[in-house]
Amino acid sequence: MVAGTAGWWVLLAYRVPRVPSTPRIAIWRKLRSLGVAQIGDGLVALPEDARTREQLEWVAADVDAAGGSATLWRAEMLSARDEQLLVTQLQQARAEEYRSLLTEAEQLGADPVTDRARTLTRLRRELRRIRRRDYFPPPEEELARYAVESLAGRTGQPIRVEGAPA
């Protein structure tokens, strides 16, 4: 195990029938919303904890219900290099999402918007959504969090910086 990595991983190996496509697309969207690392075709991974294990168990049940096959595995990387590559893949995916959120927050701060409070609420919701699937926070997380919450001061809303020291 590498410092700052998971140690144990939950792997989901799955196959979903091509037809009908609706269940396959729903499963793909669910996996995407969980922030999985794509290891190969039909093989995804998440760092192991009770929450991620349960989430992948639910996806496996959805795969079975769609007429496919799914197997859950608990694995430990034998190579520190391979584990770091997987962690980096997850970090880069979340960093891209945080950068997008940061850009939107900066644009909102620069533009005179009449309904800034509603947009701020949406940005906060998006930030929470990204953080739920962020297992190895990149530096962009803190920047996006600060940008979103600094808007609160300009809208008159209370500033709620999650995870910041009191």
Name every feature range the model reports, one short phrase each.
Residues 126-166:
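Glycine-rich, aromatic-bearing surface loops/beta-hairpins
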Residues 20-23, 112, 158, 165:
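Proline-rich intrinsically disordered, low-complexity coils
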Residues 1-110, 119, 131-132, 151:
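Positively charged, polar, low-complexity stretches
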